[in-house]
Amino acid sequence: NALCPGPVLTPLLAKYLNTDERRNRRLVHIPMGRFGEAEEMVNGALFLASDESSYMTGQSLLIDGGITAAYTTPE
């Protein structure tokens, strides 16, 4: 199994997205309208490591705010 995170609001990302223009340019691609939090990624990892996922195999756990589901290839 694999944990596939989307953009997570960390100090490093916050430093890069230091203007409203830069931040909004990224947010427009996230259907949930916000960046992920580290705790949300941790919860996914804990699920994969738990007995709750004991019958889950060969899967990608997408925690990306809907980016993958909404992605369209530019023409």
Explain the meaning of each model-derived region:
Residues 5-15, 69:
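Short, flexible catalytic-loop segment of classical short-chain dehydrogenase/reductase
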Residues 56-58:
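Short, small/polar-rich loop/turn modules that mediate ligand/substrate recognition or access, typified
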Residues 15-30:
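A short C-terminal helix-loop "cap" of Rossmann-like NAD(P)-dependent dehydrogenase/epimerase domains
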Residues 73-75:
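A short alpha/beta connector and helix-capping loop motif
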Residues 30-41, 52:
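A conserved structural motif in NAD(P)-dependent oxidoreductases
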